[in-house]
């Protein structure tokens, strides 16, 4: 990209039964947009490893604001570390408070953000949240080698999440997102 340099994204490869959950989300979204159901291959092979995975679709029809609750619960349940990477940092009060509380408890809370803005207004909005994060010991880090577009979270080296949901109110309540 001429303006930003290389984009930093993270991709997930999923196998086994969890793929059907992703297909179902795709099917629901496709039907919502096109009012038709495409043919899908539903055959998935069971994964040999004993991995636990879940798919979390969120969006404006989600009455529970699930992504917001998941991020807040990740902060509340973390004991050692909570590392998040997101291109946008405009959390609501509940998520910001959970991040602050985690840091006060001694959790290593780090949020990796892009150095350059792709949406200036959102980038500028984040600065007020920096001022509410740094005094609590939350480490805000900048990615300099291009544009950081990944949306990932690591909790205590035992749980990880990655997908399309950002750390902002649009992803909490408005956008259709999927995280695994």
Where do the protein language model's features map onto the residues?
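Charged, low-complexity intrinsically disordered terminal segments
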Residues: 1-180
